[in-house]
Amino acid sequence: MQLLSQYWGSLNDRKNLQKNFDLDAIFPALLNSLMIAVPVISSTFAAVERFLINCKSESSLGTIIIDEAGQASPHMLVGALFRAQKAVVVGDPKQIEPVQTVQDLFVEKIGGEGIGKYRSKELSVQSLADAQNPFAGIIKNLDGSESWVGCPLVIHRRCKNPMFTVANELSYGGFMINKTMEPKESIEPCKESCWITYDTSNIESTIGKDRYIQLQGQIAFELIQKLRARNVEFKDIFIITPFTSVAYGFKKYMESLSNDIVNWTKEDNKKDWLDDNIGTVHTFQGKEAKVVIYMLGCQSDDSANGAIKWVNANNVNVAFTRAREYIYVIGDAVKWAELNKNLAFAQRYLPIYTLKDF
């Protein structure tokens, strides 16, 4: 135990231990000893390199489990996979994709012939594992193509309709079966799940890549107030958006409103709600709430056409499946239906209103 505390203690303790022992040689014994007391050890891709710095032998670990593998780029796993005897890869390739910071031109030039599919920026640990899995299901995509998904879990237990139907038909080809139970304490919304549009004639273009629309922020706030009047708590409401600038803009707007106008209470914990319940789709993976407000942002003129087209099925799927009971989409219904096939598909299952209809 003394050796364990020295190795995983402070940096000075490890340096002192290194004076008397070859850390590479004793690491397997130290790890085995640790796992007698702690059978399962968790880490992150960012931290596992340092954790295994003295583990340099192939297949020296037992089984590693990679969670949320659909978000991980393959190169992040190479070191841990080299050291493991077995790997269990768990994730959803139809949800959040890896965040890739490498420039497109570099990705195109670095690879040789015959490896085109491995140069995709959307390639994940999950998709590579699925490609090697003989036990799989074929999912038909909205564009008619097919995806090979290893050992798919087909029972869904989170969302009511229309969220389930939109996600199931958009991303899973109708593959899933909905077994979501009725909530023990259901809420009484001010309106059914719907798309909220608005008059776009006075919306001005914003600068650069800022996609926040003040009118959408005002609509979202009014909707929150109407939900609060129906005893829906702040903690049960997520504000999700495809764009960082929209999340930032709405958070600043909410901060600018006086506490009396918003009617915050001590139980609401204003700071935590602003930090945790407003954000981009990427920050809500694995989370859920009774109500989701999906704020699309984007100007109605041509300045945001590229941004509108950028929002893919994975983004829509994650946003919709965060909502257990109700979803409200805020955006220019005409523009999004015209330029984005994924949101156009979602509109089939959502009545379109303006805030005056509430």
Residue ranges, per PLM feature:
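Short glycine-/polar-rich loops that comprise or flank the Walker A/P-loop
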Residues: 60-61, 83-86, 145-150, 190-193, ...
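Interdomain helical connector at the RecA1-RecA2 junction of SF1/SF2 helicase-like NTPases
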Residues: 113-203, 209
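Helicase C-terminal subdomain and adjacent C-terminal extension
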Residues: 103-151, 254, 301-358
